[in-house]
């Protein structure tokens, strides 16, 4: 995504993607939440330790029915043994947040189900956690069949997208929000 943004590649909406690297994963999750409140479709990429720091904001995002996708490279959590192999204890610790979960087992599945996650979150207003093995799959070099924007664009629920953007915070139409909004 960094390379695509630097090259000025357009996303499915014809816009150049903005990549923002934060100092910590907790800050990244807060930035995702704020960006979603402002009406921007937002996603983040993280690994195990980072996901644990994002859990408080994940509750807020799910509770406010904000459509987003967290892509997670699942690995063993750091301990005295410092194991880098994959397991799902990080993802399982976030299962109670209200995020729907998709798991992949190959590089092609990561590509395919990432699109499914983004399309599904827009339609359902349920945030998604899209995760895969953070050692084997994330290091695998494999040819994949890319999903093209032209193929995905007709699948976007335009009405749900318009409703999401209409709910965005706007200084011209101020509102006070709490957990019931």
Ranges and model annotations:
Residues 24, 106-107, 175-180:
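Intrinsic-disorder/low-complexity, polar/charged segments
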Residues 42, 64-73, 94, 116-124, ...:
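Short secondary-structure transition/capping segments
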Residues 84-134, 146, 158-161:
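Conserved thiamine diphosphate
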Residues 37, 111, 118-120, 167, ...:
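Broad hydrophobic/π-residue packing in well-ordered secondary structure
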Residues 27-30, 56, 78-83, 102-110, ...:
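Low-complexity, flexible helical/coil segments
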Residues 13, 128-180:
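Conformationally flexible catalytic loops at phosphate/diphosphate-handling active centers
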Residues 1-93, 98, 115, 134-135:
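Thiamine diphosphate
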């Amino acid at each position: 995504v960094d390379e695509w943004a630097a090259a000025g590649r357009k996303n499915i909406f014809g816009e150049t993607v903005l990549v923002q690297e934060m100092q910590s994963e907790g800050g990244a999750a807060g930035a995702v939440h704020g960006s979603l409140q402002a009406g921007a479709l937002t996603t983040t990429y993280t690994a195990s330790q980072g996901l644990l720091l994002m859990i408080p904001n994940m509750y807020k995002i799910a509770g406010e029915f904000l459509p987003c996708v967290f892509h997670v490279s699942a690995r063993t959590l750091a301990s005295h043994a410092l194991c880098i192999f994959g397991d799902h204890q990080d993802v399982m610790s976030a299962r109670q947040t209200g995020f729907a979960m998709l798991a992949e087992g190959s590089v092609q599945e990561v590509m395919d189900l990432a699109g499914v996650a983004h399309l599904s979150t827009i339609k359902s207003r349920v945030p998604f956690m899209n995760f895969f093995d953070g050692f084997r799959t994330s290091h695998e070099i494999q040819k994949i069949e890319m999903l093209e924007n032209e193929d995905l664009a007709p699948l976007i629920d335009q009405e749900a997208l318009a409703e999401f953007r209409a709910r965005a915070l706007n200084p011209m139409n101020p509102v006070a929000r709490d957990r019931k909004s």
